[in-house]
Regions:
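FAD-dependent flavoprotein oxygenase/oxidase catalytic domain
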Residues: 10, 48-53, 72, 95, ...
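Active-site Asp-x-Gly
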Residues: 30-32, 146-151, 156-208, 212
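ATP-binding pocket architecture of kinase catalytic cores
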Residues: 2-106, 122, 145
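Hydrophobic packing residues in well-ordered alpha-helices of helical domains and bundles
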Residues: 35, 81-84, 133, 211, ...
């Protein structure tokens, strides 16, 4: 019996058994609540998507954990742009009205993010960087005017799995909520697929979300006393200011 551990996740500890089964264990109560949300969403969502997503074979409430078959694949680089767009279209067209999901007041939630960043991240920047950081924080006021849709909220390379050159699976749905679909384009438009033809306003908001990504990493590093997260987060933050 082989056992591999992935301890990198913010919310979950992951164990892989015999290269076949994934055991996902929340680190705290908020993560356990996210896991319960996933358990309610994924069975309804799976038939609507052109890719694999986790299908929980076992879900325990106490202690909280889930088990599902490993979805095989390598992290997305520049593969299968048409397949990725087909996945996004299906995801954002999904009617989640009957599913218990977070439905935050989007602007207010981002105002709260900005307030935290202003308190704990902005002071870590050099004086010459702070004005640009403050200008970015003020741009959260422009995150309006979109039709809220189901969003994954954490689409990056390690959550988009490719087999034989095609997008085959999407994992880690803990952040799924009703929100701005531009958030799901943030990394995609600013790394693997910058030439995609998309609406200018969607691209603008996606760029904002991408620029804010490292602020969350710095905050996480400070909160969990992990200096490496702070260091790498600040490096990425500066590159996106």
């Amino acid at each position: 019996m082989g056992l591999r551990e992935n301890d990198d996740g913010w919310d979950f500890k992951v164990l892989i058994l015999d290269d076949e089964w994934v055991l996902r264990i929340p680190r705290n109560e908020p993560a356990a609540a996210k896991l319960a949300t996933e358990a309610g969403l994924l069975p309804a969502l799976a038939p609507a998507l052109p890719v694999e997503i986790p299908r929980f074979e076992h879900a325990s409430r106490e202690p909280p954990f889930v088990v599902y078959r490993l979805i095989r694949g390598e992290p997305l680089r520049h593969d299968d742009p048409d397949g990725v767009r087909a996945f996004l279209a299906a995801l954002h067209a999904f009617d989640a009205s009957g599913i218990d999901l977070p439905r935050p007041d989007w602007l207010e939630a981002w105002r709260e993010n900005a307030a935290r960043f202003r308190d704990v991240v902005l002071p870590l920047l050099e004086p010459g960087e702070r004005s640009r950081g403050e200008a970015l924080l003020q741009e959260v006021e422009t995150l309006v005017g979109f039709e809220p849709r189901l969003t994954h909220c954490d689409l990056e390379a390690c959550h988009l799995l490719v087999r034989d050159g095609r997008l085959a699976g999407v994992i880690d749905w803990a952040g799924a909520r009703i929100g701005d679909p531009a958030l799901d384009y943030g990394w995609l438009l600013n790394d693997p697929f910058p030439d995609w033809d998309v609406d200018d306003e969607l691209r603008r908001r996606a760029s904002l979300y991408y620029r804010f990504g490292p602020w969350f990493a710095v905050e996480y590093g400070l909160r969990t006393n992990q200096p490496e997260w702070v260091r790498s987060g600040l490096e990425n933050l500066r590159s996106r200011l």
